[in-house]
């Protein structure tokens, strides 16, 4: 589990939902009949919440007011298992509160309650002390700047320098027009309007996009410059060339918090050693999930996997799979299935013959890496899942992040759990949740390890 420190402006998002069918007799304004209300974590706290949804360990650093709103905010963070030891109380300011009034699913007004003054010297020192204390134990840092007073120029630059000194990835979500504030960061995530405002350059062509990203890289020393382009995806530089990672088409209900989702998912992807292109694809998928919901929504790993793997209808997250199954006789097996070969296909065909539905649990890339080492898998989970789903004997594929499929087996309760004959006299994980466990012989002479060794020998020759 990656440990990430999030520093920035903490915002309470308050939503009033209802219907408006008449004007007030007091003034020509609509009257909202409130039907429901809810409070969400916003700003840097929404970034932290997104990271929790993506299975990270999060330390949050920022400031709340000495008020009831601040107390509720801290309780909400703790309920999400977000570490609040870096959150300070400022007696001179209120907790930032943004109230959105929504009628018939359309936002009609937003009311902001906030103080944007810079922090006093004592609070700045205490925030920096916390940052300095945590920097050695965490894997990466996100600076979530909403221009509410927490991340001033000096504090931002000091934190970036400390992160670089300790060789930590540090990403910034910028505000304002002086990007020297974020110089030497690993990556920043401005949107089109923010970058145009900062560079006084209209991003209306490939040439200008490329020029803007070159400025970020050369003038501000941003290691991985990129810009988010709403429905046009994410643009970045690769070996000096402009690359566009297109967005994933999906109906948009609300873009609130989408930027927080992007920086959270980019951070985790890069910490998992994905390429920048793959990280952008992952971030686009996460954003596609949240814009399809109302409010500052979250994206789970399962929802993101569904978006990424939507090219094949057999690849489903567990929740969707459970909704799909009926009264069929279910056979379940699992594995890494790296470099799919004849032995795999034969094994799966024999497993399918035991029942009506064959479900294959597939270890994710991270899971394979933990089990088999940093050089595996050879084939990505997206491609492995697609290849398995393309086999006629396989009815469904579900990817799991854990080291074992115990959660899948417990939820599915298969009629038959199939494992290889090499499990003879060994404990078969999840067998207590299956009606029957079947150990099946592999076809002799076929294995992924043997294929890898043969490739190595051929290459060496």
UniProtKB/Swiss-Prot annotation:
GO BP annotations listed: ADP-L-glycero-beta-D-manno-heptose biosynthetic process
Superkingdom as given in the UniProt entry: Bacteria
Reactions the enzyme catalyzes: D-glycero-beta-D-manno-heptose 7-phosphate + ATP = D-glycero-beta-D-manno-heptose 1,7-bisphosphate + ADP + H(+); D-glycero-beta-D-manno-heptose 1-phosphate + ATP + H(+) = ADP-D-glycero-beta-D-manno-heptose + diphosphate
Its EC number(s): 2.7.1.167, 2.7.7.70
Positions of disulphide bridges: none
Keywords: ATP-binding, Carbohydrate metabolism, Kinase, Multifunctional enzyme, Nucleotide-binding, Nucleotidyltransferase, Transferase
Family: In the N-terminal section; belongs to the carbohydrate kinase PfkB family.
Protein's UniProt name: Bifunctional protein HldE
Organism: Helicobacter pylori (strain P12)
Lineage: Bacteria, Pseudomonadati, Campylobacterota, Epsilonproteobacteria, Campylobacterales
